[in-house]
Amino acid sequence: MDRGRAPAFADQSALSLLLTGPRYEVIPAQGIEQKVAVLPYGATVTVTASPSLGLERTLDVSVALAARGYRVVPHLAARMVSSRGHLERLLQRLDGTDIREVFVIGGDADPPAGDYRDAGDLLEELAGLSHPFAHVGIGGYPEGHPLISDEALLEALRRKQPFATQLVTQLCFDADAVARWVRLLRDQGIQLPVVVGLPGVVDRRRLAEISLKAGVGASLSYLRKHGRQIVTLARSRRYDPTGLATEVARYAADPGSGIRGVHLFTFNNVEPTRDWVARSVGGPVSPAS
């Protein structure tokens, strides 16, 4: 399928369903509150955690956006949490807010700030604390990880499954890989609902650069496997996710797939991504009032 071509009617219906209530991931850089303001009231916004900005910045932005009526999901990076006391203070920041979901990841801090080396460590600590979260997301790698074996990734998911309510995948360009991975999870007894991580409408060159830096993109094996896609990404101005999202929507149309939506990596290009979602589901293209 041509990734820029409008989907057929049946595919359009599946795509509209998949894109109903998407998650918009943003980076808590300066000015992000103004960029998010174009989203409709109540939209789900996830706020990343970066060693360069700190978890406190993640929570500052999360609290501010929640106060504006968004459904906010802060990322908690285990390797950025220095101690149980630090974790308790972070949770206290959310007291009095409507934030009821977190996304727990290992993170990129090297060395780690404390004793939490991966998401499993932090999830186990969270389970022993009083916290307000009705939903806890964890990450998944449909195309594998350059530094972790597939078996180790599966074992980590088995460890984390009791503490989580859903899986959110790493940025992915291969719908078939997502489908194979979901089937593998089910065969291995991992039954968490899956939210598929897709690129939003972003600058192709920037997307290519970030794809090489983030997660699986750092490995030579990834470059060998996806080099053609990376070159293609860099050739024109903006990436259109319609084709990829439509392919994912076909798999998601099977209720047994367990695919429950999409997590859109906006890289802070919120407005064009929002406009694409609105066009795809047939809704109005208008900012929040």
Give residue spans per PLM region.
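Active-site beta->alpha loop and helix N-cap motifs at the rims of alpha/beta catalytic domains
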Residues: 2-154
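Glycine- and other small-residue-rich loops at beta-strand/loop junctions that grip anionic moieties
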Residues: 24-25, 50, 79, 146-149, ...
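Active-site pocket-lining/capping segments in soluble small-molecule metabolic enzymes
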Residues: 24-28, 115-141, 191-253, 268, ...
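Conserved, mostly hydrophobic/aromatic
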Residues: 74, 160-163, 196, 248, ...
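Active-site glycine- and acidic-residue-rich loops that bind
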Residues: 81-85, 110-118, 169-182, 204, ...
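Catalytic cores of alpha/beta
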Residues: 84-93, 151-157, 180-186, 203-211, ...
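Active-site glycine-rich loop that binds ribose-phosphate moieties when present
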Residues: 147-167, 177
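Charge-patterned, long linear interaction tracts outside catalytic cores
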Residues: 160, 259-275
